[in-house]
Regions:
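Structured alpha/beta reader/binder surfaces that contact nucleic acids or chromatin modification marks
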Residues: 2-5, 9-99
Length: 99
């Protein structure tokens, strides 16, 4: 059985933070679009794309909840996607840094 997947496009900065192991929660504004794609769909896996390039990583979703975001200037509650941290082998195999 194939896992339900959510695909999210990230800026290069946030993508690199995931690969480096610093980021394990993705925040999305509470709106109809994300409510439908994340809360209602209940994905088990998230695919992050580095911008609109072919560079992608897959992570298993540990939980999805609603709560505050720790970033300055991001007020209110957000949809929070908690995902597994990539192992060193996974980040080396999937991610090829730009030269």
């Amino acid at each position: 059985m194939e896992l339900k997947t959510c695909t999210l496009v990230l800026s290069h900065f946030w993508f690199d933070q995931i690969v480096a192991g610093f980021k394990t929660v993705e925040y999305r504004r509470r709106c109809h679009k994300w409510q439908k794609q994340i809360i209602e769909k209940k994905p088990q896996k998230v695919v992050f794309s580095k911008g609109y390039s072919a560079v992608k990583i897959e992570c298993m979703i540990e939980k999805i909840d609603i709560g505050p975001c720790p970033y300055i200037g991001w007020e209110g509650d957000f949809i929070r996607i908690h995902f597994t941290k990539l192992s060193k082998d996974e980040s080396k195999a999937i991610y090829q840094p730009e030269l």
